[in-house]
Amino acid sequence: MTQKLHIKTWGCQMNEYDSSKMADLLNSTHGLELTEIPEEADVLLLNTCSIREKAQEKVFHQLGRWKELKKHKPGLVIGVGGCVASQEGEHIRTRAPYVDIIFGPQTLHRLPEMINQIRGGKSSVVDVSFPEIEKFDRLPEPRAEGPTAFVSIMEGCNKYCSFCVVPYTRGEEVSRPVDDVLFEIAQLAEQGVREVNLLGQNVNAYRGATHDDGICTFAELLRLVAAIDGIDRLRFTTSHPIEFTDDIIDVYRDTPELVSFLHLPVQSGSDRVLSMMKRNHTALEYKSIIRKLRAVRPEIQISSDFIVGFPGETAEDFEQTMNLIAQVNFDMSFSFIYSARPGTPAADMPDDVTEEEKKQRLYVLQQRINNQAAQFSRAMLGTEQRVLVEGPSKKDLMELTGRTETNRIVNFVGTPDMIGKFVDIKITDVFTNSLRGEVVRTEEQMGLRVVQSPQMVINRTRKEDELGVGRYHA
């Protein structure tokens, strides 16, 4: 009888990527098949996030539910991974002794061995170490699930912003070798992936080793990925302003596959608050990056992250943030009320902004950006938008749905052969959370750029072992 695996994932796109790799890995080593129903599972994994307030309590609340399942199924293996696991380590078992495995973001590749140890009679396994990039060397070949895919190109962060736990939970910056990244993307392209989103906590700090002991910059990697035939849309998440160099901006000038949409976190528009956050840039420097980008891509739209109510933030500081929002004209944001993360420098600062004031500032900020986003959507009425078709529409199964470069959902009447391809759509209706349009051009009529086929990339890359790690042939 086939054994089942249930993974519950909280947090960022990196966690989503990690969870997909856990599923592929355990399917290849143990034959575990994913299930959405925890009660069916033989292995339960909780992939955690420590960014938001009360993250630890959320974990123990979920584990309490799973404890009841283990009472009725003694052989059930329960594992906790992700950033809370990295932060709390063995302490998790102090409060939840029924947890069998505790692993960090950098040790998920050791899950098969950990499960074997538990099933072999070991009471628990805890491994929250930071073995650099080793995890990517032990993962199975990627499996495409639709026309879009995430590919992790680096781990960790060296910036040590005063409010952030990432350097402590995911370690410092380590980049994957460029050939490994290209090999994974070429494999995905062979399976029909058309859009790739490059992932990293500070993705534009990428410095990947090359086959000849050189270093590939992030700008160079973007061009290499865009040159793979079939990859006709390229994104990346998340970047830091101090690493957003002119060579990256130049890629926007000459690489049409790179979308006209950028998520570039700023957190605050006040230089005083940015200094307390240890962001190491000013609001003016941030705006300078946006000006340069719009000089080469006038249509580019920008999203960002904001924290309101940071310790010491005054009404004037918040007003400077609102001024920045108006000047940059952000299309969307991920905005949050500040909450102290244990172990970070900001946690020792006096939290002197009232809860009521924090909520009010968040409301004002989100209303402003929502209004700006609505204006962008209305401006799309009557325009042609290139859409990557994802599948049937959730609103009407007789229609298809896809996304624009700016991640807007578009519903339209089409044919099944369009799924997984690009179509040009004339926008005829604008709604709060989606657009509607009519097909004006199919992919066959577009003349998309072909530079090198995925098989060319794969052919010049040899496998170093059976798990799909490759390097260039000289």
UniProtKB/Swiss-Prot annotation:
Pfam families given in the database record: Radical_SAM, TRAM, UPF0004
Documented EC number(s): 2.8.4.3
GO function term, MF aspect, one: 4 iron, 4 sulfur cluster binding
Alphabetical keyword list: 4Fe-4S, Cytoplasm, Iron, Iron-sulfur, Metal-binding, S-adenosyl-L-methionine, Transferase, tRNA processing
Annotated HAMAP family: tRNA_metthiotr_MiaB
CDD domains assigned: Radical_SAM (cd01335)
GO cellular component: cytosol
Amino acids binding [4Fe-4S] cluster 1: 12, 49, 83
Domain Radical SAM core positions: 143-375
Domain of life: Bacteria
Enzyme class, broadest EC rank: transferase
SMART domains xref list: Elp3 (SM00729)
Name of the encoding gene: miaB
Signal peptide bounds: none
Functional summary from the UniProt entry: Catalyzes the methylthiolation of N6-(dimethylallyl)adenosine (i(6)A), leading to the formation of 2-methylthio-N6-(dimethylallyl)adenosine (ms(2)i(6)A) at position 37 in tRNAs that read codons beginning with uridine.
Keyword Glycosyltransferase: no
Cofactor(s) required for function per UniProt: [4Fe-4S] cluster
PROSITE patterns: MTTASE_N, MTTASE_RADICAL, RADICAL_SAM, TRAM
Name listed for the protein in its UniProt record: tRNA-2-methylthio-N(6)-dimethylallyladenosine synthase
Domain MTTase N-terminal: 3-120
Gene3D superfamilies: Methylthiotransferase, N-terminal domain, tm_1862 like domain
Substrates-to-products reaction catalysed: N(6)-dimethylallyladenosine(37) in tRNA + (sulfur carrier)-SH + AH2 + 2 S-adenosyl-L-methionine = 2-methylsulfanyl-N(6)-dimethylallyladenosine(37) in tRNA + (sulfur carrier)-H + 5'-deoxyadenosine + L-methionine + A + S-adenosyl-L-homocysteine + 2 H(+)
Cofactor: binding details: Binds 2 [4Fe-4S] clusters. One cluster is coordinated with 3 cysteines and an exchangeable S-adenosyl-L-methionine.
Protein family membership: Belongs to the methylthiotransferase family. MiaB subfamily.
Binding site for [4Fe-4S] cluster 2: 157, 161, 164
Organism the protein comes from: Pasteurella multocida (strain Pm70)
Locations listed in the record: Cytoplasm
Upper taxonomic lineage: Bacteria, Pseudomonadati, Pseudomonadota, Gammaproteobacteria, Pasteurellales
Subunit relationships: Monomer.
